[in-house]
Amino acid sequence: MATINQLVRKPRVKQVVKSSVPALNACPQKRGVCTRVYTTTPKKPNSALRKVCRVRLTNGFEVTSYIGGEGHNLQEHSVVLIRGGRVKDLPGVRYHTVRGALDCSGVKDRKQSRSKYGVKKPKA
């Protein structure tokens, strides 16, 4: 335990918390343009073709973003909205594209968890 005199001479240093989503600049979402849309394979125990896109954001950052849901309509030059949230089995993918916003359509025929995939309530 430091004495009061020691603390007067050299105060305690606050620990700096490093952001897990630096490209967002403390914003909830950011807009960007797809520069490349492709599939990639996950880490060891899993096997799939995960849909991802490279996005150039409005603040100049270029990030890799995951496209959730079954099927998508994204191609090069599509304008997308990016939110934080990493994909555990894809190294370097720290962002998600927001479905149903800007050029990214919602998931077709989605009935459950619709709000996460940009789907309106179906007519009864």
Swiss-Prot record:
It holds the Pfam family Ribosom_S12_S23. One of its GO terms (biological process) is translation. CDD domains: Ribosomal_S12. Keywords: Methylation, Ribonucleoprotein, Ribosomal protein, RNA-binding, rRNA-binding, tRNA-binding. The modification 3-methylthioaspartic acid is found at D89. PROSITE patterns: RIBOSOMAL_S12. One of its GO terms (cellular component) is small ribosomal subunit. GO terms for molecular function: rRNA binding; structural constituent of ribosome; tRNA binding. The keyword rRNA-binding applies. Signal peptide: none annotated. It comes from the Bacteria. Belongs to the universal ribosomal protein uS12 family. Part of the 30S ribosomal subunit. Contacts proteins S8 and S17. May interact with IF1 in the 30S initiation complex. PANTHER family: 30S RIBOSOMAL PROTEIN S12 FAMILY MEMBER (PTHR11652). With S4 and S5 plays an important role in translational accuracy. This is Small ribosomal subunit protein uS12. The lineage of its organism: Bacteria, Pseudomonadati, Pseudomonadota, Gammaproteobacteria, Aeromonadales.
